A protein has these predicted regions:
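Active-site catalytic motif of lipid deacylating hydrolases and related acyltransferases
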Residues: 1-17
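Low-complexity, repetitive regions of proteins mediating host interaction that are extracellular
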Residues: 12, 36-37
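Structural motif
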Residues: 18-20, 47
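Gly/Ala-rich beta-loop-alpha elbow adjacent to hydrolase catalytic centers
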Residues: 20-25, 29
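Active-site signature of alpha/beta-hydrolase-fold catalytic machinery across serine-
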Residues: 31-35
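Helical cap/lid subdomain of alpha/beta-hydrolase-fold lipid enzymes
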Residues: 37-213
Length: 213
């Protein structure tokens, strides 16, 4: 991650920087802050999208598939989540409190959640995988319906509750003018690469980011 020249490498303090993180990148940064390896100075703005603060059931699913515990799985979902054997990155996203998440992982999640809530500036989550009209939209719809999510409110990969973990849910709004924006975008849409929807205010991630600047 590139930071400003005023940041302090000796203390790991990030100053005068705008951070945008998508998905697991925010969990990694939260864990680094919780472990004392990084500090977010008040002069820095941290913008986060689709953060799996409790993990993702996609990790549990791919581990079950690779362990032979799932039958009738869809090959395109496996391509989306990653192939067997499961790598360490995939395993590290096991959903908090489940059989694939160790006591140490559960504790690390809790610490990361506290660091996230205390330092993040603006957050984009999604309570629907309907998303924008793109070639991959059907794949994320399939993931949203097929994966064993705890809630139907998910972006295909990350549940709304996981993304908003540690933050008051009444602080979220479906207006792109809200710093805490609850959308109807799928997981890839929240990375901004597919632009904005035409009609719904709940599908305008780029406009949301512009309003933050």
């Amino acid at each position: 991650m590139q930071v400003s020249s005023s940041s302090d490498p000796a203390t790991g303090t990030i100053k005068d920087t705008i951070i945008f993180g998508h998905s697991m990148a925010n969990l990694i940064l939260s864990g680094s802050v919780a472990a004392g390896r990084a500090k977010i100075d008040p002069s820095t703005s941290w913008v986060a999208a689709s953060t799996p603060m409790e993990g993702s059931m996609g990790s549990n699913y791919i581990q079950e598939v690779c362990n032979g515990e799932q039958t009738g799985f869809v090959a395109t979902i496996i391509d989306l989540l990653g192939k067997c054997p499961v790598n360490s990155g995939q395993m590290s996203l096991a959903y908090q409190g489940t059989n694939f998440s160790s006591a140490g992982m559960n504790a690390a999640y809790a610490a990361a959640q506290a660091a996230y809530a205390s330092n993040v500036t603006a957050v984009l989550c999604s309570n629907s995988f309907s998303g924008l009209v793109t070639v991959k939209a059907a794949l994320y719809t399939l993931a949203g319906e097929l994966l064993p999510h705890h809630s139907s409110q998910n972006d295909g990969i990350v549940e709304y509750g996981s993304c908003a973990m540690g933050l008051p849910q009444d602080s979220f709004d479906n207006s792109y003018k809200s710093a805490r924006y609850v959308t109807e975008l799928n997981h890839v849409d929240t990375s901004f690469r597919n632009g904005d929807g035409v009609f719904s205010d709940a599908k305008k991630p780029v406009k949301w980011f512009e309003c933050l600047l």
